[in-house]
Amino acid sequence: TITRGTLPPCAECAKAKAKQKNVRKIGISPKAEKPGERVYLDVSKVTVRQKNGGEYNLPNKWWCIIVDEATGKKYALFTRTKRGITEPVCEWMHRMNSRGIKIRRVRMDPGGENISLKKRTESVDWQALQPVDFEYTSRDTPQHNHLAEVAFPYLAALGRAMLDTAYVPEKERGRLIVYAIQLAVQLDGLRIVEMNGVVATRDEHMYGEKPKWTKNMKRFGECGVVKEGKNGKA
């Protein structure tokens, strides 16, 4: 005869059905309404592959992205090492303070380089940056740092598109990709967005005016003539 019994839990079945816990779509903390109230920060490694499957040896291969939550304004810093972002980020925060934009909160993952950044901002050398609150995201939850996470593929794609449009030779792509990404970051500041009912560029929301270099914009990859001599100008 067959009788009904009790079966122990199947560990293999539980592992097969396991998935990451859903992350709430609406955050608990209110969104920043002013420039500098909260910025998102993350670090990634830049890799540029060659046609033969190898990779270019980039001198500054570590890319630190900073995104202002209120305006969406992006900033890119490139360093030789992952922990090398500490000083450049402090210098960036100092430059923002000098322009009247105080950085209040920094959201980032609890990586070693980010913990070093927090300690550096609390040092005597950068005491003027205080007070700054650091918000650490949970492990394996890139959704909590989404503005920085999404900015990486977005800006990298723009950089590759610029190189392709300019027909940059294969041997020069590794040298120019960082420069192209930096230009893409600057051009993203000209994107028109709405903030508190005001429609303007990200730069205008951030600084109150458009950058002066917009009057002298040239197409990426355009040939130019450099005159040398006493009165030579590029």
Model-based region annotation:
Residues 99-100, 159, 173:
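Short, intrinsically disordered/low-complexity patches at protein termini
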Residues 153-166:
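A polyampholytic, Gly/Pro-enriched intrinsically disordered region
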Residues 101-102, 164, 197:
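Secondary-structure boundary/capping residues
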Residues 2-155, 206-234:
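Retroviral integrase
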Residues 167-230:
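Charged, gly/pro-enriched flexible loop segments at helix/strand junctions
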Residues 152, 156, 182-185:
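Two-component system phosphotransfer/interaction surface
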Residues 95, 158, 187:
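Solvent-exposed, charged/polar functional surfaces in cytosolic regulatory/catalytic domains
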